[in-house]
């Protein structure tokens, strides 16, 4: 039986320490509940939310598993300037542990680009992310995305097509 009160929420697969606090009234109403944690304490600066689902409560700790990462629109908007092209995409990939993930990458070019360059960037992004996700487990994908490793690899790959000023994964969500 869980007593009512304030609990620390942990996501052991993503972060070392607590990610947020949660008021718990009953165990029944808490398990399976979605939580939103600000990424400013985990990642590099104020940039988005980490979405999780509570899976268990033990020893005055609430344990959650990751469901998604979303960036704030204002974070992305800071990099968009006149004379640049913003490229968005959305597709579903499968991880090595057969979990379906919806990926929404966003890229901002240094200058305005033609449709052929736009298409080439989207195609290269899809190919790279589908291949990378197929080789890694879901938790590793979340960790790499959270720490910016996946974005660095993607940006390096896309530099061969066209120079980018910004390359991020805007949303990474677990599909049902």
Question: What are these regions, as identified by a protein language model?
Answer:
Residues 79, 83, 144-145, 175:
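Surface-exposed loop/turn and secondary-structure junction residues enriched for glycine/proline
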Residues 129-132, 150, 158:
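A generic hydrophobic-segment detector
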Residues 153-176:
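Extended, low-charge, aliphatic-rich alpha-helical segments
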């Amino acid at each position: 039986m869980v007593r009512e009160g304030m609990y620390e929420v942990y996501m052991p697969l993503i972060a070392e320490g607590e990610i947020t606090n949660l008021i718990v009234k009953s165990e029944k109403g808490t398990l399976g509940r979605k939580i939103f944690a600000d990424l400013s304490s985990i990642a590099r600066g104020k940039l988005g939310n980490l979405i999780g689902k509570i899976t268990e409560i033990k020893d005055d700790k609430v344990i959650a598993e990751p469901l998604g990462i979303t960036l704030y629109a204002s974070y992305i908007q800071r990099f968009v300037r006149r004379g640049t092209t913003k490229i968005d995409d959305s597709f579903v990939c499968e991880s090595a542990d057969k979990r379906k993930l919806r990926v929404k990458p966003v890229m901002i070019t240094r200058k305005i680009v033609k449709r052929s360059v736009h298409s080439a960037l989207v195609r290269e992004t899809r190919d790279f992310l589908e291949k990378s996700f197929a080789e890694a487990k879901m938790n590793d994908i979340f960790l790499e995305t959270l720490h910016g490793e996946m974005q660095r690899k993607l940006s390096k790959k896309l530099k061969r097509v066209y120079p980018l000023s910004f390359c991020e994964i805007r949303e990474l969500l677990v599909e049902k």
